[in-house]
Amino acid sequence: MNAVMTVDLSELDAWSAQVQRASDDLTGIARNGGHSLVQTDFGPILETMMGAYNALLPSVNQSLEDNGTGMRDHAEALRATARDFTLTEDGVVRRHNAHGVDARDGSSSFFDVAETTIRRAAPTETSLPQISFGFPYDTVCDLVRMLTGFDIRAELAEKIGGDVVGASMQGSSFGSLGTSMKGVAANLQSGGQTISKTWQGGAADAAVGQIGTWVASLDTQAAQLVQMGQNVVQICRDAWQTALAVVQCVKSAVQTVSAALATMSIPGVGWARVVQAVFQAFQAVMKAYQAIMKLINILKQVKSFIETVKNFFDGDKAPVSTATAPTATGAPGSVTRDPRSVATPTVGQRPVAVTA
């Protein structure tokens, strides 16, 4: 049975260059991730998810590094394949004592179809609203605790501190990296489709199939990164809004009790007004407490999602890049060509079908 193999070395050279660009892009993504996705402490307001988040980052960064390394190996394998074909051509020329002509004239078919520049990450939130501490606040806290047993400082104020600016910056970085990776996958897919038009045979099928595996892997990784970024950005927005709600509730409580304290010296009604105001303040701070509990429940859901993403990246391995190239040593018998092509070897041109 004869197997048909055709190759245009100009096209193969251009494709290996495109795969090398993809490797450079993936290396840049890994470098950016190493700088922007760092383990840290975003404070008590995001504390519920921080353990899972910090455990995720090493897995993500390792996968990003593996992508760059694996794609670089694949680009080198394609260059080796092109060299192999050239040696084979030279062997055929020597066998027939012919004059070889390298007709490679370059190729403009392998242009990138998607942008891979990593968008500069920026925070999506400003600093958290804060409670102004002072004598009125402490007085209200003491009165509420004395009459209700609820400590505003421990249950509210200390829980709304944190760095949502830095957290949302990292969320933005996740999205930028995922978007860039989608672009790399699109470029590889386009290149694989283009090379299939001029390179056929077992080696071509193996190399193009491997690129297809890469495209699927990168697309899946990119989707995880983008979703992760969206969730982090959203939880930062939720945290900011929760902090604002807490501050507004506490301010309302302070104003209510402060107004009552101003009338405490009135005989018969002063203390009663204070007690009534304290209970009104308690109702206000309980709304704030409920807002924090709602945020914590959302954080628990985000934590579960982060753990799922970590499991994905822990199990995700970059495709093994060992492109199956014909092992040609340049010996005359490596490839049997149509005799019509021997006098002027067709390196770099679209040749007649080669039988092997």
Summary of predicted features, one role per range:
Residues M1-S173, S180-T198, Q210-T213, S217-A356:
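Intrinsically disordered, low-complexity Pro/Gly/Thr/Ser/Ala-rich repeat tracts
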